[in-house]
Amino acid sequence: TEALGPAAYIGRCRVVPLRNTGAALSPMNAFQILQGLETLGLRMERHCENAEKLAGYLQQHKKVKWVNYAALPDSPYYTNCKNITNSKASGILSFGVLGGIEACTRFIDSLEMILRLVNIGDAKSLACHPASTTHRQLNDKELISAGVSDDLIRISVGIEHIDDIIADVSQALDKT
């Protein structure tokens, strides 16, 4: 402890419980991870399919300023997406809502099926407004540097039926 000071205690707090209990998963957790891995391919197909359809819908919406999704032909990342992932760009997209932060707040608050959470990769659709959640501690210059604008909404598109996802996004956009 003399050489490391308080860091020695922190290290002990991390190492001793692992030494005593091991870093082994419980049988139930191991089973659930295995189940998730076995269906990952199927779920990713649905995530990508739904995200591409939602991105196409958003491109046509009058209250949407821009859409960022690599599988769209007008994306600057389209060629890379096509070459690397066979045009499957994942289940995450972002878009800009006309009306700025106030419209984004109304959009997020109006979602009914899509959950308002900042994590990604769930089977359920999730949405967030990064400027007021994950990046809220940044100043304006840092937000710009991070590519986060006041009008940006990020959606992790789930595996629900695409008609349900679009209906929820549509009714929320109508309230902006």
What positions do the PLM features span?
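Active-site C-terminal subdomain of aminotransferase-like
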Residues: 1-92, 96-124
